[in-house]
Amino acid sequence: MNSQIKNKAVYWGTGRRKTSVARVRLIPGNGQIKINGRSGDDYLNFNPSHLNSVKAPLQTLGLENSYDIFVNVFGGGLTGQADAIKQGAARALCDLSPDNRKPLKTEGHLSRDPRAKERRKYGLKKARKAPQFSKR
């Protein structure tokens, strides 16, 4: 069964963070990143922390120049989208080989970050901010 996985040319993974959802395709190549049809540098505004976040799963396995990353991502902001891409790439690498799961799990690339915006409650101005209290 392992040989069947190796022969497949495209590896898919889905990642989520806050309200962002990323569908990631890994294709054997030279390490280029395309996000929504634009280069990864251009889409992420040349922000090194976002770029490092996207490349982290490949760097963990030493495959940063072996696979091209093609992404469709929507929702949220750039930080949420970058972390969603990271999780999607990690899941695609698990599809590539089951042996990749353990190092990716120890680095935390497969974990869904549960933090999201807290809902606003009635009687308050924001999720936790109360109107000014006057004793008299």
Swiss-Prot record:
- Per its UniProt record, what PROSITE patterns does this chain match? RIBOSOMAL_S9 (PS00360)
Q: Which GO terms describe its biological process?
A: translation
So which domain of life are we looking at? Answer: Bacteria
UniProt-annotated stretches for the region Disordered: 96-136
Per its record, what are the GO molecular function terms? RNA binding; structural constituent of ribosome
Q: Specify residue ranges for compositional bias: Basic and acidic residues.
A: 98-116
Q: Enumerate the InterPro entries for this protein.
A: Ribosomal_Su5_D2-typ_SF, Ribosomal_uS9, Ribosomal_uS9_bac/plastid, Ribosomal_uS9_CS, Ribsml_uS5_D2-typ_fold_subgr
The biased composition feature labelled Basic residues covers 117-136
- Which Gene Ontology cellular-component terms appear in the entry? cytosolic small ribosomal subunit
What the entry lists under Pfam families is as follows: Ribosomal_S9 (PF00380)
Protein keywords: Ribonucleoprotein, Ribosomal protein
Q: Which SUPFAM superfamilies match?
A: Ribosomal protein S5 domain 2-like
What family, per the record? Answer: Belongs to the universal ribosomal protein uS9 family.
HAMAP family membership: Ribosomal_uS9_B
Report the protein name in the record. Small ribosomal subunit protein uS9
Organism annotation = Prochlorococcus marinus (strain MIT 9515)
